[in-house]
């Protein structure tokens, strides 16, 4: 089979990225993140309560919910509320978002409160979970900045930034930031979450069509690190404009 050739961008290029801060007015932090044709609204809401297992422990919590609008895909999706339960995929993704954000937050400095993250996909073209993480961090940082500017917190509990991107192999070619056609036809698919200091929070990798070697995984991680560096700059630009 011939090697895959991208038409619209280089193999090591991200899709066009745009992050619009303060996208919604009725929340403590929000943004719209656009990764090519994938678009996700991310919000952060401050709650002056914590889950029961944290009461009285003088520390906070960050948790996340994720969902897709019925018309976000080519064929209308059934609302999970209509089905009466969340899918396993939805639960997996929202746990991933929460874990990724908690990894960069000092919960004691956050104090006994929680921040609720909502990621709603309004248009899907691959990479919705990674876009959600990248956008959710912007919403979280805006909400935490509000706590600091209002004098509720004396210092920012966020240790460093976090972003995520997908990488994969299509017909033997390593690619950065897969869109839906690439993702659905790839040999392997890996989602990587990384901090600004280059530390890995999570690697989710699957051989969809052909197993991959440790050497190939290393190349994919390096490719992801390049893309995440660019995403971190987009986050910084959005927050500077907020």
Swiss-Prot record:
Keywords: Nucleotidyltransferase, RNA-binding, rRNA processing, Transferase, tRNA processing, tRNA-binding
Pfam family, one: RNase_PH_C
EC number: 2.7.7.56
Any one GO BP annotation for this protein: rRNA catabolic process
Entry-linked Gene3D superfamilies: GHMP Kinase, N-terminal domain (3.30.230.70)
Gene Ontology terms, MF aspect: 3'-5'-RNA exonuclease activity; RNA binding; tRNA binding; tRNA nucleotidyltransferase activity
Residue numbers binding phosphate: 89, 127-129
PANTHER family per UniProt: EXOSOME COMPLEX COMPONENT (PTHR11953), EXOSOME COMPLEX COMPONENT RRP41 (PTHR11953:SF0)
Physiological role: Phosphorolytic 3'-5' exoribonuclease that plays an important role in tRNA 3'-end maturation. Removes nucleotide residues following the 3'-CCA terminus of tRNAs; can also add nucleotides to the ends of RNA molecules by using nucleoside diphosphates as substrates, but this may not be physiologically important. Probably plays a role in initiation of 16S rRNA degradation (leading to ribosome degradation) during starvation.
Family: Belongs to the RNase PH family.
Protein's recorded name: Ribonuclease PH
Origin species: Neisseria meningitidis serogroup B (strain ATCC BAA-335 / MC58)
């Amino acid at each position: 089979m011939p090697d895959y050739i991208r038409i619209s961008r280089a193999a090591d290029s991200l899709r066009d990225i745009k992050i619009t801060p303060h996208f919604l007015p009725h929340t403590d932090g929000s943004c719209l993140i656009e990764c090519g044709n994938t678009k996700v609204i991310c919000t952060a809401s401050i709650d002056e309560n914590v889950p029961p297992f944290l009461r009285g422990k003088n520390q906070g919590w960050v948790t996340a919910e994720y969902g897709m609008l019925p018309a976000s895909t080519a064929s209308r999706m059934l609302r999970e509320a209509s089905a009466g339960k969340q899918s396993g995929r939805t639960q997996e993704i929202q746990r991933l978002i929460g874990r990724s954000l908690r990894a960069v937050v000092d919960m004691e400095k956050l104090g006994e409160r929680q921040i609720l993250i909502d990621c709603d996909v309004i248009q899907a073209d691959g990479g919705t979970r990674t876009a959600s993480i990248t956008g959710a961090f912007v919403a979280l940082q805006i909400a935490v900045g509000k706590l600091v500017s209002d004098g509720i917190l004396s210092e920012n509990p966020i240790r460093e930034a976090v972003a995520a991107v997908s990488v994969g192999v299509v017909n033997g070619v390593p690619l950065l930031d897969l869109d839906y056609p690439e993702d659905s036809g790839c040999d392997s698919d890996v989602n990587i979450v990384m901090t600004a200091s280059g530390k890995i929070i999570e690697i989710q990798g699957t051989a969809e069509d052909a197993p991959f070697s440790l050497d190939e995984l290393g190349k994919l991680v390096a490719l992801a690190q390049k893309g995440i560096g660019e995403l971190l700059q987009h986050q910084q630009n959005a927050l500077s404009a907020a």
